[in-house]
Amino acid sequence: MNFLPFLIAKRLYHRNNKNHAVLLVSILSKIGISISIFTLILSFSALNGFQILIKKNILSSLPHGIIELTNTSAFTWKDITKKLESLPEVIYSEPYVLMNSVLLKNDKMRFINIKSFKNIKYIKKYFSFQKKLYNFSKLKKIYNNEIIISSDLAKYFSLKEGDCINLIILNKKISFDKTQIQSFSFKVKSIFHSNGISNSNIGLIPFIFFQKFFNIKNNINKIELYMSDPFQADKIILKIAKKIKTPLFFYNWMYSYKYIYHDIKIIKTIIYVTLFLIIIISCFSVISICLTSISKKTKDIAILRSIGANNILIQLIFFYYGMRFIIIGNLIGLLTGIITVLNFKKIMFFLEKHFEENWFLKNVYYKNFLLLQINFFDLIIIFISTLTIGIVANWYPIYYASKINPNKILKEY
């Protein structure tokens, strides 16, 4: 490998640093590129963390998908769940029963939904990320006359574990004119922390309760499923349809919360485009530095051409020279961004400790709902994209340098 172009470019770089104007522009270019990349890394890490928190705080308590059978005589819910659980993308599936009811306690009443669950192990798993305020992790077995309620309901009715409540359940499965209304007494077995509207008015009751009192052993046409990657729900649903090979209706969480998923993509695109425009502007200053250097070194270029240097050598010299600014700015931005993300909690702790009276630190969003998560794929995209912009930006100075006529230049001296 010929290192001559690189060595000449290095010498040219150090010589131009003695020129204060060129030095100032080069420093500002590096700062612009590094700040843009630093901001890109922080923004992408925040959005990646936001996706993780959505998965934990919202998608943990919602079915990722619901399958509705069109013909229960051809397939039972047990047949479908066996097929579903053979797919690696599906973590768990079970019958989906949701009924309307009225909760009565201490002269208070509230309309709530009651939902079935079949396996306590998976209920514990999906709420495992929460703070152990209600000893939810100790829950081992639940009977058909016991219920798990949300913290919002517990607060509204002043309930605690072991309290008894009355539920009037409305069963619409029969028909509108024969709607079955029944009253039941339940013991509060445990309480889970609510994550907002999605599960604030819900109670979880064992599936055996619905089998016993509503005679729905095989008359179930809906199955809920939880996926390993909820953000790929559309693709997983299509794979399920090919696997089952029977007419079914499919729903997934994106139909109800599609705006969250699309907003993340839109915000990520806007940040990406905006900051890369800043990088492009910074690269224009690199172009000006290269052109300034070329205009001052026309005599040297002419001498090199006269002693046998070809176009490729001249182009490589100024290619290395221009890319040096972009690579240095790129690496500074990447390193500072990665270090900041990895030490984000320590930085926030330090700021909170030393700025206790600071109004900004008391009211910012990160305290409650911000997680920074580095994605290696994002780092590669940022690095390669910046280098690509740098190569394109350096094209004109390289072309200009290679077209210098040595005869015309040397005649002037």
Swiss-Prot record:
Q: Where in the cell is it found?
A: Cell membrane
Tell me which domain of life the UniProt entry assigns to the organism this sequence originates from.
Bacteria
Q: Which GO terms describe its biological process?
A: lipoprotein localization to outer membrane
One Pfam family it belongs to: FtsX
Q: Which UniProt keywords apply?
A: Cell membrane, Membrane, Transmembrane, Transmembrane helix
Q: Which residues cross the membrane?
A: 22-42, 270-290, 312-332, 379-399
Which Gene Ontology cellular-component terms appear in the entry? plasma membrane protein complex
Grouped into one coarse class, the protein's main location is membrane
InterPro entries recorded: ABC3_permease_C, Lipoprotein-release_system
Q: Does the keyword Transmembrane apply?
A: yes
Q: How does it sit in the membrane?
A: Multi-pass membrane protein
Q: Which family does it belong to?
A: Belongs to the ABC-4 integral membrane protein family. LolC/E subfamily.
What protein name is recorded for this chain? Uncharacterized membrane protein BUsg_286
Its taxonomic placement starts with:
Bacteria, Pseudomonadati, Pseudomonadota, Gammaproteobacteria, Enterobacterales
